[in-house]
A protein has these predicted regions:
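Charge-lined substrate channels and their catalytic hotspots, especially those that engage the 3′ end
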Residues: 2-299, 306-351, 383, 390, ...
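Electropositive polyanion-binding surfaces
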Residues: 45, 183, 192, 197, ...
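Non-cytosolic beta-sheet module surface loops
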Residues: 91-93, 158, 641-643, 702-704
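Acidic/polar residues at beta-strand termini and the immediately following turn/coil
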Residues: 103, 169, 363, 442, ...
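A short macromolecule-binding patch
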Residues: 108-113, 174-180, 657-674, 722-728
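Intrinsically disordered, low-complexity linker and terminal regions at domain boundaries
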Residues: 124, 141, 663-706, 710, ...
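A generic structural signal for residues embedded in beta-strands
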Residues: 128, 198, 644, 698-700
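Outer-membrane beta-barrel proteins
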Residues: 188, 627-629, 688
Length: 815
């Protein structure tokens, strides 16, 4: 082969290959010099390669260069990666080990090949470049840098394979093991199958697995005791406060005269907290009174966390990293140390507390006429619970303390709530019919019961007060051009709207192509009393976009507000703390502590920490439900079809509030097709159909703890489209007379069968000698044959006469 090129790597290529092809350096230089993308054929022609082996070798080299992030392939053309932008992204890996890089600030993903996934864990932050677009139009990427490792420690079971020890993470999204030295195993005195906690020493590369060392053996712990710390580590949640952070938090004392300077004193006001029975940190207190000229005054006092968490201090850095408190089923991972979250920042009863206040005036009709924000000092008059207040509003005067001012305020709050409830309906804020649950636990952290949680009037009263303050804060920031993070909830995407519209039309309800909150709420109202309301509302909910934090106001679609933010929970949400700082800075005529690009980055970060917390909490809840259902394998329950897909039905059990799946193969002897419009699985042969809201009886077939999946088997469909389905008795044929032959056959079948003798042989029956046919029998046979022939001749003649007569009649008609 004649070479028509000068290769800077020619010597190295010649040492490695008998028949060298252009090196990677030469290929990149050639594409760069041509200043345009080149195909494989273009390069073959340029280098004048003629033999088939070298042509194929060049093709393999180009593919390898794409794989290694040196070239980008677009269709059949190759171009330099330097022309491709670098994106910040987060790694997401599913339970099958397939992964994508989700690009920041975009609704786009890049698929990652197995080689790229070797060097990352689920949740890692990376920089990626696009390398190719496949035939389905999906982008593939290359990891140029891992910028942040989410997982630093992990809990899993010790395993061994061919003398090599490793820990296999239990999280279904953890796709690769962490290797351990045999000496470390022996020193820690752990054995295969034990749960252990490991710290990662060397993170994985494209060529090697991660390595680590054992921190703690957890072999003596029950699985239910391990699941929360295991999840905390797997999601990279900060779980231990550093010593300097604890020291910072504990350095503050009870509010003194100096702390109260420049604050409005509200200690004589009958402010109270209203929270759940198990609440320990109290962010907010409320008070209401009727104004002399008509209307209402509402005071919403929020813990002044910004007084204690100072910018750039260790305490602030730790809170910023956490972003939010994480609420597991029976454990809270707080954003702030306990000295603040349950102490100085918590609006505990009968002690002075520093707060930020939203003081509002409302008209008789509930419209906000004015508001102001200011720092204050308060003294809570009572720690009330939702249950106490609800019972008091229902007529139990002993449910809350005998404090006249407190009772008067609670009564006024309830009157105002009745007014605000009407305004909520007028603006068409969405109120979905969903069932919230809570769990009770045993001593080892396992579920004892799953029970429905009811929202009473006290819950809704406090919710309306918080909405008033949050909306006022958003309007205040807009009016005064204060840089801050809005809570943004955008309208649904068109593709999601189409799915909802097709489904809602089948319910006989109108739904436009560009729906407003009014259109959504109309469907909610029209279906709220139906038995399948939760399933219908779940379809509407799934069409909603995910809310996020951002510096640009885009309104809140779900709540039907033009502007909205979070002001009321700074103990557990860092964005609320940022807003308090921004309002304080404005009141003091100082520049805002955060603005521009830094504010945008903050919005991205806190949206991510919120999602991380939600995913971690959901993962634990799902695991605990799976663990709980292990004791019910083989039992039958009644459930409601809550979602449908091509591969089966998702069913929520009525009594246990647990979700599982009935695979399409378990639905019966039919071929089922998924109908997107009606959200149904329809049998093509027998017409049986399964839709949202259908009631079914299932049997718990199996539980997979690692994958967090519960499998059901269908026992019986109990209802469809709101109508009960009665069990049908099997069809029975009508009785007919029994023939002689059947009688004799039955008698023959009922005769005792021959049994074996003691020797094991069956007795042999002697055959009767054959008897020759008599003359009589021969005559009878002959006669029947003759008779049969005569009968055939008669039938033929009769048929001929009938045809002749028909022909004559036809002729008469024509004439």
């Amino acid at each position: 082969m004649m070479k028509n090129w000068v290769d800077p790597e020619a010597k190295a290529e010649a040492e490695r290959y008998d028949n060298p092809i252009p090196s990677r350096i030469l290929i990149t230089e050639t594409i760069e010099n041509k200043k345009q993308p080149l195909s494989h054929a273009d390069l073959v022609e340029h280098f004048e390669i003629t033999d088939q082996k070298s042509i194929e070798a060049l093709s393999h080299r180009l593919s390898a260069m794409v794989r290694d992030g040196q070239l980008m392939k677009d269709g059949y053309k190759f171009q330099l990666m330097t022309d491709q932008p670098v994106h910040d992204a987060t790694i997401y890996i599913n339970n099958k080990g397939l992964g994508v890089a989700s690009l920041d600030g975009k609704k786009e993903e890049m698929l990652l090949p197995e080689r790229e996934l070797r060097q990352v864990f689920h949740g890692d932050r990376v920089k990626v470049q696009q390398t190719s677009i496949d035939r389905k139009g999906k982008a593939w990427g290359f990891v140029t840098q891992v910028t942040q490792r989410r997982i630093k420690q992990i809990i899993g079971k010790l395993a061994e394979y061919e003398g090599e020890y490793f820990i296999q993470p239990a999280n279904p999204n953890a796709h690769q093991p962490i290797t351990l030295e045999k000496e470390l195993i022996e020193h820690a005195k752990v054995k295969v199958g034990d749960s252990i906690r490991v710290e990662i020493d060397d993170f994985p590369t494209r060529e090697e697995f991660a390595t680590g060392h054992i921190i703690q053996s957890m072999a003596d712990k029950a699985n239910t005791e391990i699941i929360i710390p295991q999840t905390i580590l797997e999601y990279g949640l900060p779980f231990e406060f550093p010593d300097d952070v604890i020291k910072d938090a504990e350095s503050f004392k009870e509010p003194n005269e100096k702390d109260r300077e420049g604050r409005i004193d509200l200690r004589d006001l009958a402010l109270v907290t209203i929270d759940g029975e198990d609440a320990r940190d109290f962010d907010d207190a409320v008070y209401a009174e009727k104004r002399s000229g008509g209307g209402y005054r509402v005071v919403v006092a929020i813990a002044d966390v910004s007084h204690y968490v100072r910018v750039d201090k260790p305490l602030d850095e730790e809170a910023k990293e956490r972003g939010t408190s994480v609420y597991f089923p029976h454990f809270v991972l707080p954003m702030l140390p306990e000295a603040l979250s349950n102490g100085l920042c918590s609006l505990n009863p009968h002690v002075d507390r520093l707060c930020m206040v939203c003081d509002l005036n409302l008209s008789r009709s509930g419209k906000v006429t004015s508001y102001q924000f200011y720092p204050s000092v308060m003294h809570s008059k009572a720690r009330l619970t939702y249950t106490q207040v609800a019972e008091y509003l229902d007529g139990d005067s002993n449910a809350i303390p005998e404090d006249r001012a407190v009772r008067k305020s609670v009564n006024t709050l309830f009157q105002l709530y009745q007014v605000l409830k009407g305004l909520r309906a007028e603006r068409h804020a969405m109120e979905f019919e969903t069932v919230e649950t809570y769990m009770t636990f045993d001593d080892l952290g396992g579920i004892k019961e799953i029970l429905p949680r009811s929202r009473n009037e006290a819950h809704k009263l406090i919710e309306e007060c918080m909405l008033l303050a949050n909306v006022a804060a958003a309007e205040y920031a807009l009016k005064n051009e204060i840089p801050m993070l809005y809570r943004v909830h955008e309208p649904p995407e068109f593709s999601r709207i189409l799915k909802v519209r097709d489904y809602v039309k089948l319910l006989g309800l109108p739904f436009p192509e560009q729906p407003t909150q009014k259109d959504y709420q109309a469907v909610i109202e029209a279906t709220k009393d139906r038995i399948d309301a939760p399933s219908i509302h779940a379809v509407l909910l799934r069409s909603m976009m995910q809310a996020y934090y951002g510096p640009n106001n885009a309104g809140h679609f779900g709540l039907a507000y033009d502007a909205y933010t979070h002001f009321t929970s700074p103990i557990r949400r860092y964005p609320d703390l940022l807003l308090h700082r921004a309002i304080k800075a404005h009141l003091q005529q100082k520049p805002s502590p955060l603005s521009g690009g830094a504010l945008e980055e903050a919005g991205t970060h806190f949206s991510a920490t919120e999602r991380r917390a939600d995913e971690a909490s959901r993962s634990v809840t799902t695991w605990l439900k799976c663990h709980y259902m292990q004791q019910h394998i083989g039992e039958e329950f009644v459930g409601i079809v809550s979602a449908t897909a091509e591969f089966g039905l998702f069913v929520t059990l009525k009594d246990l509030y647990v979700d599982g799946m009935v695979h399409v193969s378990q639905l019966g002897d039919d071929f089922f097709v998924f109908d997107q419009a009606s959200q149904s699985l329809v049998g093509q042969n027998r017409g049986q159909s399964f839709s949202l809201g259908d009631q079914v009886r299932i049997k718990v077939a199996g539980v997979n703890l690692d994958d967090r999946k519960i499998d059901f088997e269908l026992v019986q469909q109990l209802s469809h489209a709101g109508r009960a389905i009665r069990s049908r008795a099997p069809r029975v044929a009508q009785p007919r007379p029994i023939t002689k032959e059947e009688v004799f056959n039955k008698l023959f079948d009922e005769r005792p069968k021959a049994v074996e003798t003691e020797t094991g042989e069956r007795p042999v029956r002697k055959k009767k000698p054959k008897v020759k046919s008599t003359e009589l029998s021969k005559k009878t046979e002959k006669k029947s044959v003759v008779k049969s022939a005569e009968q055939k001749a008669k039938d033929k003649a009769k048929k001929k006469a009938k045809a002749k007569k028909k022909k004559a009649n036809a002729k008469a008609k024509i004439d």
